[in-house]
Amino acid sequence: MYSFEQAITQLFQQLSLSIPDTIEPVIGVKVGEFACHITEHPVGQILMFTLPSLDNNNEKETLLSHNIFSQDILKPILSWDEVGGHPVLWNRQPLNNLDNNSLYTQLEMLVQGAERLQTSSLISPPRSFS
């Protein structure tokens, strides 16, 4: 089983970033235009999240269509924070499930999800069935 510090060290090595001298409880990584945050929450889970900036024309129903079930446990989930009502895109995985590529894949899927959300105004809402 990896520790949070070992997981962050491995991810930074894969991203060719300098490893911080002190690994804080929440680590930030900039990927393209997205600030991605990584923490251990709850204990034993690697949580990654970003705060996507969404166009005001996006309706929550359309955005929530991205939350459809998936076989991939790393697929990001869109939520709204309780305090400010801002969108939060997040995913997580158990520390004991990590392998050499799973953190990189988790970060990649988070960024891809954020990119899709920014273009969601081009996506029509799901059809309703009667």
From Swiss-Prot:
Keyword field: Activator, Plasmid, Transcription, Transcription regulation, Virulence
Keyword check for Iron: no
Highest taxon in the source lineage: Bacteria
Entry-linked Pfam families: CesT
Keyword Transcription regulation: yes
GO BP: protein secretion by the type III secretion system
Function: Positive regulator of YopE.
Name listed for the protein in its UniProt record: YopE regulator
Protein's organism: Yersinia enterocolitica serotype O:8 / biotype 1B (strain NCTC 13174 / 8081)
